[in-house]
């Protein structure tokens, strides 16, 4: 029996009764993912970069300020995934959403960049706590259509990724940073309310154990997952790709300003990237279930690397929008397949740990990209810096292409 809702493994969970109706937990998860990402992404790009510049942060530090939420994820996602396996998915999701509902209001207190850094570290706890639990629950309930379901859930999250920058830039252009922070906080509170009707977790499996025993079990489970070379290889590929994603999130807004693109248009550029991803992820996930994960990963990563090289060689709203749409298509090809491949590789009952390890390694790349890019941009400029980041992505792609031909990856 399933620990969360008492269902047989692989069957969809029973729909809870909400306000006299029947609402699927999968729909609730997708709505939570949308609202959570909408709140979160409002303050990631372009607002964080522009706000950091407004309060006097140097160029090299802006990458750190954007990446700091991701740095939190590096250290928190790994144990949070394992804790979800032990204590329940819903509990971990609620903890993360409490942070998501409160963190945006703290931005109102920021006047200097070191305080902004502290707030960003705290804000990073939100996704670090709930994201592995949400992905693990989807992967666990739908093993026969894992990539398709994860693609649909990813599309729901990416609806928030699409609208977040657009809404954030629009509110910023209309009424300033303070109102944008408040709007983000209100949306975060709505995400918390949505997750409340989900079926309650069973009593934690570890309540009868001491803290030391629980910790020892977590370490053993995580060590088993980290020790799987196939999981490490897939995570490395996703991490390297997200070094490019993080670079764009941190420095594309600043580059766009140098080529006379307005704040509102910057939001639309990021929105275009998200629309491409949202529209294509479910189809990419379904196709990967049929054809195989590996071709989609290789093709998508290659496309993203080429686009990353090209972006700083163009100027104007329409060229930047076009290249960002292509970048969104590339990530849509990759992420449903990498996440599903992780699900293919793990043992039953270890989905949370696996997604936590995957998320932590993914976040390492997501954080390192902007940090390296900031130094390179200050030293060499946008064109050379973006080309260097793309070169690292291509190197990782070659490693993945050669290493993923083993039997442990199966037919997919």
Label the model's feature ranges:
Residues 22-67, 232-233, 237, 242-259:
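Helix-loop boundary and gating motifs at the non-cytosolic
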Residues 76-88, 281-292, 377:
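Helix-to-loop junctions at the C-terminal end of transmembrane segments
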Residues 8-23, 201-233:
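Juxtamembrane intracellular "pre-TM" segments in multi-pass secondary transporters
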Residues 103, 114-122, 318-326:
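Paired small-residue
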Residues 70-78, 161-162, 274-278, 282, ...:
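Residue-level signature of mid-helix packing/kink "hotspots" within the transmembrane helices
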Residues 119-158, 340-341:
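Cytoplasmic helix-loop-helix junction between adjacent transmembrane helices
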Residues 186-207, 396-404:
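C-terminal membrane-cytosol helix-exit motif in multi-pass small-molecule transporters
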Residues 91-105, 185, 295-309:
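Structural signature of the two symmetry-related core transmembrane helices
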